[in-house]
Amino acid sequence: MKWCGVLMVALLQSLCCSGLPLYQSELASTADKALVVTMTQVNNLYAGLRLYRVSRGSIKRVVPLGLNTYDLIMNFGIKETDCLKSSGEDPQRCAFRVGFFVPAASCTARVRVTAEFTQVVSLNCGQDSSSSESSSEENFTRKRQQLNVQPFGNRGPVLPVPGFSEATRFPSHSFSRQEVEPQPIPRGDSFGNHLE
């Protein structure tokens, strides 16, 4: 009866696990490989003139997907270095920039690691809360990059062209200057303050 209980516990534990477990030494080398790929992506996509380097990091979760296939969910911090992006240097060998307004960010990444390849599944970086550069949050997302373009931001008022009038442009129509009140269009997503 005792052997039956031990066998049952062993069977239940084996059914709960998928894939082979990562041991501490394997986890460290796998995480290093994932971090190198992630930092390459960060520096290719988001770095300005200078490279970023990891300042701190941790693995939040290991998700086994199959035999020797894992998703690592990592949290890490990055900070700008003295090395220029065009230098081709390894960012981990570069010194951090010193100063009060040095850009820093906190990042979360999901990296798929297999025996053949390492791939960044998702990457999200936001301005570090300890950075004093600004209080607004910047999000860098691999899936969706936002561009802040103001197409009419630099244009001034339209000046009339001499010798050109509305009457010459539309000769069959006469325009009288009337103030037209714009009609509000209900959007359907507003709420009233009364119950029906």
UniProtKB/Swiss-Prot annotation:
InterPro entries: Cystatin_sf, Spp-24. Disulfide bonds join C83-C94, C107-C125. Residues 129-138 have a biased composition (Low complexity). It comes from the Eukaryota. SUPFAM superfamilies: Cystatin/monellin (SSF54403). Multiply phosphorylated at serine residues. Residues 125-196 are annotated as: Disordered. It is found in: Secreted. One of its GO terms (biological process) is bone remodeling. Coiled coil: none annotated. Residues 1-19 form the signal peptide. This is Secreted phosphoprotein 24. It comes from Salmo salar. The gene is spp2.
